[in-house]
């Protein structure tokens, strides 16, 4: 398998970015639900799970930036769109995903930086990822509305990704089982394309 994308399929780097980011996002959605809905305020586990959530989010951000750079340097294989409508829907959903995989962690980072608690991110226990310096010196009263605005934005974007994910998976399965083309195989390692 080629490292770079070819006319027929994605290369190993693009596949790795796709699947690693997808798994990290799914893990982070689950962690986000867990600490937001099921862990009581004041429970020390809430802080720990929140740190994992933030660490994964920052990892998604870094990997997504690298993925966008890689995509700009390696054009993707041309998809076999059977209709102009499918072409348009595919392009909109892919650009929406690229926007979301960047915007969700960015809004999370800004939200964390504007938190009245002032905690940085303990990046997987290796080091503290610093907050944005723009919020330093602000009082809790000044930070609270900023934090809440970014938190709301973060949650709305996360829900948008949750809604878009089954559409993306459904479209890949539709291509594979209904149209019987190679769209899904192009992103799966170890598959052959006719």
Predicted regions and their residues:
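Membrane-embedded alpha-helical bundles that constitute the cytochrome b-like, heme-associated redox core
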Residues: 1-194
């Amino acid at each position: 398998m080629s490292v770079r994308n070819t006319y027929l399929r994605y290369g190993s780097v693009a596949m790795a970015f796709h699947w690693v980011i997808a798994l990290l996002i799914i893990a982070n959605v689950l962690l986000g639900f867990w600490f937001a809905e099921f862990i009581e305020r004041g429970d020390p586990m809430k802080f720990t799970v929140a740190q994992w959530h933030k660490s994964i989010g920052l990892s998604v951000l870094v990997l997504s930036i690298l993925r966008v750079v890689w995509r700009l340097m390696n054009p993707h294989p041309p998809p076999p769109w059977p209709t102009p409508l499918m072409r348009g829907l595919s392009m909109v959903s892919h650009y929406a995903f690229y926007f979301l995989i960047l915007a969700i962690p960015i809004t999370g980072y800004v939200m964390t930086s504007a938190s009245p608690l002032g905690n940085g991110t303990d990046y997987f226990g290796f080091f503290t990822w610093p907050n944005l310096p723009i919020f330093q010196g602000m009082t809790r009263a000044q930070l609270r509305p900023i934090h809440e605005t970014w938190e709301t934005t973060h949650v709305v974007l996360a829900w948008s990704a949750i809604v878009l994910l089954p559409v993306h998976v459904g479209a890949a399965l539709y291509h594979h089982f209904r149209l019987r083309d190679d769209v899904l195989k192009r992103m799966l390692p170890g598959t052959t394309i006719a």
